[in-house]
């Protein structure tokens, strides 16, 4: 199966180190979830906050057969921390989706309903 990766950087100067980090994290995701069809990683600088300085947002869109999963992490001062948190969230979401597909999700019994009987 062919895999496509798209890296988008907005309002921020493109960095080879940032791209290498994204590629490394995507390769890690791909090794644990080989059924991924495509991945789009968007790194965006939201602007400057008057107290915290620069703010970064990372959004990851992953397509698997029959499903699209989105992970988005807002407002972090360090772009690499925002990347780490977004990829950690995506890893958890992919793991949960795989469990759901295998049917390993815990099911709860239907709640009991009480019947009121009146004796006359």
State what each model feature region is.
Residues 1-120:
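N-terminal, polar/charged subdomain of small-to-medium soluble alpha/beta proteins
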